[in-house]
Swiss-Prot record:
It comes from Fusobacterium nucleatum subsp. nucleatum (strain ATCC 25586 / DSM 15643 / BCRC 10681 / CIP 101130 / JCM 8532 / KCTC 2640 / LMG 13131 / VPI 4355). One of its GO terms (cellular component) is ribonucleoprotein complex. This is Small ribosomal subunit protein bS6. The gene is rpsF. Binds together with bS18 to 16S ribosomal RNA. The keyword Ribonucleoprotein applies.
């Protein structure tokens, strides 16, 4: 299993309770695919470098985890259909 980081941006129109639920859903998605979550950091709402879907800000979340690389594609495909996740990136740690 390798270490990865995922940074995702939640739509700013999602309320606080909805954000917490979405963070829990993403963490549950990771663990259901065999990931071990090391930590989740909520960076809060920040200005975007460029507008995404006519939004100028987003709520940033960074999660560090370990997962088998073959399971990562399934996680990414499910993240693609989550409407409240505006963007995400998964990076392998050294």
């Amino acid at each position: 299993m390798r270490k990865y980081e995922i940074m995702y941006i939640i739509n700013p129109t999602v309320l606080e309770e909805g954000r917490e639920e979405l963070v829990n859903q993403v963490n549950a998605l990771l663990t259901s695919n065999g990931a071990t979550i090391a930590k989740t950091e909520k960076w809060g709402e920040r200005k975007l470098a460029y507008p995404i879907d006519k939004k100028k800000s987003g709520f940033y979340v960074l999660t560090t985890f370990e997962i088998d690389g073959t399971k990562l594609a399934e996680v990414e495909s499910k993240l693609n259909i989550m409407e409240s996740v505006m963007r995400y990136i998964v990076v392998k740690q050294d």
